[in-house]
Amino acid sequence: MLRFGIKTWKRSVLAIRRSSTAPHVQIISNLQKKLLNELYSLRRLVDDNSPATIRVGNVSLLLSKSNIRRRIALQALSSSAEDVACVKQITHALLAAPFMPESKELKYAMDHNGLNPLYISFGTNALFERNARYSTSHLFLPSDFLQVNNLEIIHLPPGTVDSDILASCHARYICSTSYLRMTSSDFTTADTLVLDIDPKLHSLLKNEKSIIPVSSSAALKATKALQDDPHNFQNYQNQWEQSGFQQLRTNMTPTSDLEICKRFLNYLCCSFSLTKAEKDLVRATEFSNSMLISIEKWAKYCDVDLQEFEKKLQKFWKNFGTLKLYSNIESLPASLKQLIKDEYLQKSKLELSFILGELSKNGDDKNNFELAMKDFGTFQNSRMSAVDQALQPLRRKTLYTTAFQGLGALGSLYLYFVSHFSLYNAFSVFSVCGVFGLYYLQSSYRSWKKEYWKELLEEGRKFERQLCRNVFGRSSFYVQQKTAAEKKEHISLIMKKLTKTLDLMKEFQLQSSFSDSPTASKKQLL
């Protein structure tokens, strides 16, 4: 009876525990869904080809997969024999471990590695075996090589670009004869792993605290010493510890999935810092402001003596010193200098088009200046045609006035000779007709001149505004300022998403720690 009571009590306790933990598990599941949604929106915000997208994809993978592959990509910096040998040397060093004989399969695969990536997996995993892409150039090795289950090293030939490979790698190493640069492994620090091959690098290692010596040659030497003398394990152990290779091995095996996720997200926060975007925006604004100030200063030199023009121009740009566009005016073509003197300084206020065009050459758009000059040439041609068209009614009115004066003169002569008027009366009639004709001509000329200059001024101002708009719109300064402002707004939105995701991560970790069996919960949910 006592045994029956104990069993009944155990069932009751288990039932109460299940009923009490069920809502908690549901909370954790909901938090996981929210996290995945936030990460999905982050992936849509960032550029598809940027490393940030790869990292966001990795975070989503870490939260959605229960069995995670540790993947490391090794790639030569160039196709030189030294860099390729460097990759092979590092691969052999990664595979070096106590009491492990040299793998003939690995040696054959490394020697015959061609254009395709070489995959080296540790341990047996059904995921590897089911994947068709690993049917070729894939090597399975025992899991006790690095004492890490589910580890995979990818040997990439130079120039290999495979987003699928890199998207699922925890670390990617660009290998050269003198250094091994780790682009994404420990996301809290930016470490550069240097091979102890070049003696010149010792001074660099002393001054830079962020550089970790790997000494893969020492690791290989220790392994070779152990193979030559299997009984002298102490010698191997000393050389292995001196090589510092165990530290690299430890860094490649993160502790927990949640820690990896937090590292990813914290690294994203550092990557999407608003500091760079704000600096770009301020720099672009300063460039644009200095551009406008230089134009205003330039306009003050329109009435200078033409003989002193080149000297003052050189002095102006030398004192201004920011853009240094006309630091050597003698390098300008003679036709351009003459055009500046004759057309723009003497006859027109549109010398600003030259400055706008030249300033735009400070950017990448070299055709901007030519386009501005084409626009100005088109405007000059249209202005000349406008003058011709405006002169047509004046010519007609002048012809009418001349005809009116002629008729008056003929009438006065007719009256004098036929009607025997006095010469005084005839001259009076002629004078009256002439005065009326001149008055008509003068009034029409004034109205025409007023209307013509008004139209010409409006047309000139309209063209200048359009020219400035076109040149500024094509200018790299304007584009840079606009891009920086958009980038700042975009990064601000990403930072808000990241902050929200990190808050969800903290809550997720907190709720997971409250469960009865955190390990089981993580295994179930992750």
From Swiss-Prot:
- UniProt KW Transit peptide keyword: yes
Q: How does it sit in the membrane?
A: Multi-pass membrane protein
Query: Which Cys pairs are S-S linked?
Result: none
Q: Where are the transmembrane segments?
A: 398-418, 421-441
Pfam families in the cross-refs: Mmc1_C
Name the principal localization, coarsely classed: mitochondrion
Note whether Transit peptide occurs among the keywords: yes
Ordered alphabetically, the record's keywords are:
Chromosome partition, Meiosis, Membrane, Mitochondrion, Sporulation, Transit peptide, Transmembrane, Transmembrane helix
Where is it localised? Mitochondrion membrane
A biological-process GO annotation = sporulation resulting in formation of a cellular spore
| Classification via InterPro entries | Mmc1_C (IPR056196)
Q: Name one GO cellular component term.
A: mitochondrion
Out of the domains of life, which is the source? Eukaryota
Task: Report the function annotation for this chain.
Answer: Required for correct meiotic chromosome segregation. Appears to also have role in sporulation.
Official protein name in the record: Meiotically up-regulated gene 99 protein, mitochondrial
Q: Which organism is it from?
A: Schizosaccharomyces pombe (strain 972 / ATCC 24843)
